[in-house]
Amino acid sequence: MVRRTGVTLLVVALVVVALVSSVSAQLNFSPGWGKRAAAGSGSSGGVGEAVSALHHSVGGAPGGVVPPGSSSSSGDSCGPIPVSAVMHIYRLIRNEAVRLVQCQDEEYLG
């Protein structure tokens, strides 16, 4: 009887291990809650302003970049994108790339 219980527990444990090893999970974090959402509501000069600049350009602001082949009959509701918003995003990406390179250099040299 004791041996049969041990074998049953071993089989159950192996099944559980097999199931756990085949399961994968994905955790999704949204920035719309918590401390960051409250801090991001102000004007910080970050990505939020670039996005709002894109949103305000839908009416056809001067200096906007119009995608090729776009017309009123194409069904696109995006509108022109201001060059200043594109340049702001470019500068953000470039600055982060410089920071990453500096961190890598410090890690390898340190």
From Swiss-Prot:
Role this protein plays: This hormone adapts the animal to light backgrounds by stimulating concentration of the pigment of its red body-chromatophores.
Protein's organism: Carcinus maenas
Signal peptide: 1-25
Tryptophan amide modification, residue list: W33
Annotated family: Belongs to the AKH/HRTH/RPCH family.
GO molecular function: hormone activity; pigment binding
GO cellular component terms, A-Z: extracellular region
Protein name: Red pigment-concentrating prohormone
InterPro entries: Adipokinetic_hormone_CS (IPR002047), AKH/RPCH_hormone (IPR010475)
Top-level lineage group: Eukaryota
Coarse class of the protein's main subcellular location: secreted
Lineage: Eukaryota, Metazoa, Ecdysozoa, Arthropoda, Crustacea
Pfam families hit by this protein: Adipokin_hormo (PF06377)
